[in-house]
Amino acid sequence: MVEEPRKRARPGRSPAPAGRTARPRQAEVARLAGVSQATVSLVLADKRQGPAISEETRRKVLEAARSLGYVPDPAARRLAAARNNLLGVFSFTATFPTDVQHSYYPFLVGVEREAAERGYDLVLFTGSSTGGAGAAGPDALSRVRLADGCLFLGRHAPVEELGRLVVDGFPVVHLGRRDEPAGLHWVGADYVSAAREVVGHLAGLGHRRMVLIREDDEAPASTDRERGFAEGLEAVGHGSVFRSADPERDLTPERLRRWLADGVTAFVAEETDTGAAWRALRRAAADAGIECPRDASLALLGSPPADLADGPEPTGFDIPRTRLGAAAVRMLAALVAGEEATEPLVACTFRPGATSGPPPGAEDH
């Protein structure tokens, strides 16, 4: 089950119904100009923030709009001009993560503090809300339009529904890096550099063969961690990646013993909202009788789940969740105000921990 990262296919767009005679839509302008709907929205709204758009592309969009007789919906314009000082926060969970032990809770602390500082109230949505992410169809996220803009949390936000909000010009920010949909604003942590630093620490202890355990999805946060893992090993050793949709089932004590027999001396797990990879690694190591760091070193690319915080502190890094929440609100407030919206990647903090040490036999050399 050692695999290379897989590239994601970009989703297509459904064609507009044939024979329509009503007001031309942005989708038709996009087809005629040969660009995405998000690009049309940004050009027609004369928004300069977000992805750079060349003057040639702007010219094509404006010419296509003129030739089709496109006129912006005046009702939509009036709605865009109305502000009520409400920011939405949408969590793709069944209930809102207000438990202090939930991994999202520190994000929400930063969101609440920054929103209060800027004079905004918050309206909270969850995946089980009426009209929320659990609904089907083009209006799955429609209720967030009650707010001036919305911040989204979660690894598995629906691309199509988010894309519809972006195309409509509704201010949206995703907490965590996102490649899709086009034009979506996001804030994120620098997981590449953080993962590279953790691997560099292990290499400095003498480890040359490592395995990364990650869940089998394509979340950008996982991709960034894997990239940092690979970059950290480029000049010093060899690494492989174990991907599983169910790490607690597939990462067995026998598998760990085989890796150790093959010369692997360090195991690295990614952090996710489920904590599945780290849970599986800890359990398998304990069941295999592996004592860390005497027999092998363990590292976690993130922080352990709250229910596992009583064990030895893992080598790894801490994510600045409160700072990320505040950065997301700053970006969203800028979008609502029609201003430039940029936020740098936020650096993580290396954590030496107590689960790493020199590889077995290193003291003999």
Describe every region a protein language model picked out.
Residues 196-240, 342-357:
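An alpha-beta-alpha
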Residues 126, 176, 214, 244-245, ...:
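Residue-level recognition of beta-strand->loop/alpha-helix junctions
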Residues 1-6, 21, 82, 86-200, ...:
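Alpha-helical recognition/docking segments in bacterial nutrient-uptake
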Residues 71, 117-121, 171, 208, ...:
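Residue-level detector of anion-binding/catalytic polar loops
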Residues 5, 257-365:
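Flexible loop/turn connectors
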Residues 60, 102-117, 194-197, 220-239, ...:
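Short, solvent-exposed amphipathic alpha-helices that sit
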Residues 1-83:
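N-terminal helix-turn-helix DNA-binding module of bacterial transcription factors
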Residues 87, 172, 229, 295-296, ...:
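Structural signal for hydrophobic
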